[in-house]
Swiss-Prot record:
Alphabetical list of InterPro entries matching this protein: Di-copper_centre_dom_sf, Tyrosinase/Hemocyanin, Tyrosinase_Cu-bd
Gene Ontology CC: one annotated term: melanosome
UniProt xrefs under PROSITE patterns: TYROSINASE_1 (PS00497)
Key word Membrane present: yes
Catalytic activity: 2 L-dopa + O2 = 2 L-dopaquinone + 2 H2O; L-tyrosine + O2 = L-dopaquinone + H2O
Cofactor: Cu(2+)
Gene Ontology terms for molecular function: metal ion binding; tyrosinase activity
Protein localization: Melanosome membrane; Melanosome
UniProt GO BP: melanin biosynthetic process; pigmentation; response to blue light
The protein's name in its UniProt record: Tyrosinase
Species the sequence originates in: Coturnix japonica (Japanese quail)
Span of the signal peptide: 1-18
Gene3D superfamilies: Di-copper center containing domain from catechol oxidase
Amino acid sequence: MLLFTMGLLLAILQPSTGQFPRVCANTQSLLRKECCPPWEGDGSPCGERSNRGTCQRILLSQAPLGPQFPFSGVDDREDWPSVFYNRTCRCRGNFMGFNCGECKFGFSGQNCTERRLRTRRNIFQLTIREKDKFLAYLNLAKNIPSKDYVIATGTYAQMNNGSNPMFRNINVYDLFVWMHYYASRDTLLGGSNVWRDIDFAHEAPGFLPWHRAFLLLWEREIQKITGDENFTIPYWDWRDAEDCVICTDEYMGGQHPTNPNLLSPASFFSSWQ
């Protein structure tokens, strides 16, 4: 059902894979408030002819908001994604995605019935070749446009309630940077006024599962652009670390020798914008 940024814990229950599906970032979809694209396998909305899913009205939580957010109807992320769309694909079985064209995490195969076990490893236990491949995959994601998703450059009100779509292309890596920002940014109250005492991604019980789903989605997009179905994001076990031992030019980048706000020029990431 949910298909965009995971603004609420509800998105963990029915995962999404990005910000706004490109096929729904248009006037017709926004005015109809419907995002039920056809699955390319059979050409029907949500793959309905193949029993993958159906186009349904989204079900919103009726739970009251907490006192830390004393507003209603001012933030596009409220009751996400109902401000933009109130009908989306509800996928059946092990299918997921904005058109039910993906398999749920841990499944693969034509009908998403095959279990697939992937193992994440400590980044310090990777071989030099494995570590270099990981960095190369990140660099590819930074330089390849997202095929399926775009990001919003304005609020729904600025889009004139859908009649003036405001979206732009983005690369695969920055798509997830944007998703994280979009879910956690301040509430825009109009003009220069903002409400800072809110963070939909971090200051709530959904902190851990939100980031778990976020990383799974990021991992999946890198698998797709590289064709490497066995790719997993390595982890850094920092429990006993006294400083940032991963902040070296061999890994995530050391500090610039003269400017503490920049990465070392020898870092793989120093040329990123």
